[in-house]
C-alpha cells in the first residue's frame, strides 16, 4: 500500500510518500529421509517447518530545487520500521527443536546532492549521504538471547563527468566512507576507507557501446551474521554468529559491451572482483 503527494513547478519538485508493506508465509514445510552411518547406523524421517511474517511502514521525503540556470540541489530523507517474526520447528522422530525470533529494525537514511553543469561538456557535483540502522532481536526456543546492533555509515563523494567529442565519456566519483557499528556488550568499531566509482565509455554509434568500470567500497555485516547466538540447524549442526566480524571491502573492475542488432540485444564482457573479510561459513567439531 502506498500514498504519495507531490508539488511541481519550474523551480522545485517536492514529494512525500507513505508506504506499508506486509509479507506473510503461513507455512513452509519440508520432509526428508535421513540415513546416518558411522558409530550409529540408522534411518529417520525429518520435518522442517517455517513460518514468517513481516510488517514495514516507511516515510520518504524528496526535494529537488533549481537554484540557477545550470545548478540543482536535491535532498532525500527516508525512515522506516520493520517488524520481523520468524518461527522454525525441526523434528526427527521424537526429537524436537524450536527457534523463535522477533526482530525490530529501525532504519534512517539521508542524502544531499549538489550538481552544476559547466561550459565544456562537463559537470561537477557533491554528494553527502548517511545511513543508520538499529536492530533488536529476541531469540527464544532452544537458545534464548537478546541482541542489539546499531550501524552507521557517512559518505562524502565528488562527482565529475566529462564528455570528449561525440563518442567518449568519463565519470569519476572519488570519496570517503566513515563506518561505525556496535553490538551490545562489545566495543564500538570504526573504519574510515576510500570509496570510488569510475566509468569510461566509448559509444561507437547509437546502438553500440563499450564501457570500463572500476569500483571500490565497503559493506557492513548485519545482525544475522554478527551476533552471540546459537541456533539449531539439525541435531548434528549448530549455527553460531561471530561478534568480531570486520567490515567487508569490495573491489571490482569490468569491461562491458552493449549492442543492439535489430530485435537482438547483446550484453557481455569480462569482470574481476576481490572481497576481503568476506563472510563465509566455517565448520568445526566440538
Which residues fall in each region the model found?
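Primarily recognizes Gram-negative and organellar outer-membrane beta-barrels
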Residues: 1-286
Amino acid at each position: 500500500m502506498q500514498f504519495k503527494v507531490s508539488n511541481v513547478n519550474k523551480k522545485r519538485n517536492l514529494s512525500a510518500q507513505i508506504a506499508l508493506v506486509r509479507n506473510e508465509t503461513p507455512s513452509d514445510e519440508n520432509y526428508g529421509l535421513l540415513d546416518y552411518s558411522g558409530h550409529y547406523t540408522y534411518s529417520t524421517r525429518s520435518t522442517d517447518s517455517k513460518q514468517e511474517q513481516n510488517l514495514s511502514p516507511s516515510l520518504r521525503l524528496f526535494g529537488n530545487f533549481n537554484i540557477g540556470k545550470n545548478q540543482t540541489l536535491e535532498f532525500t530523507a527516508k525512515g522506516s520500521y520493520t517488524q520481523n517474526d520468524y518461527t522454525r520447528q525441526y523434528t526427527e522422530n521424537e526429537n524436537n527443536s524450536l527457534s523463535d525470533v522477533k526482530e525490530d529494525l529501525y532504519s534512517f537514511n539521508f542524502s544531499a546532492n549538489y550538481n552544476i553543469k559547466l561550459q565544456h561538456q562537463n559537470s561537477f557535483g557533491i554528494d553527502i549521504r548517511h545511513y543508520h540502522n538499529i536492530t533488536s532481536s529476541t531469540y527464544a526456543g532452544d537458545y534464548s538471547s537478546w541482541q542489539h546492533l546499531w550501524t552507521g555509515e557517512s559518505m562524502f563523494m565528488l562527482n565529475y563527468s566529462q564528455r570528449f567529442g561525440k563518442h567518449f565519456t568519463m565519470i569519476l566519483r572519488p570519496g570517503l566512507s566513515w563506518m561505525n557499528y556496535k553490538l551490545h556488550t562489545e566495543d564500538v568499531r570504526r573504519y574510515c576507507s576510500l570509496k570510488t566509482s569510475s566509468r569510461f565509455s566509448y559509444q561507437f554509434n547509437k546502438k553500440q557501446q563499450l564501457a570500463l568500470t572500476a569500483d571500490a567500497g565497503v559493506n557492513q555485516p548485519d545482525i544475522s551474521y554478527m551476533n552471540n547466538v546459537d541456533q539449531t540447524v539439525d541435531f548434528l549442526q549448530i549455527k553460531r554468529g561471530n561478534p568480531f566480524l570486520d567490515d567487508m571491502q569490495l573491489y571490482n573492475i569490468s569491461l562491458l559491451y552493449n549492442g543492439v542488432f535489430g530485435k537482438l540485444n547483446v550484453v557481455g564482457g569480462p569482470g574481476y572482483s576481490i572481497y576481503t573479510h568476506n563472510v563465509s561459513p566455517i565448520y568445526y567439531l566440538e
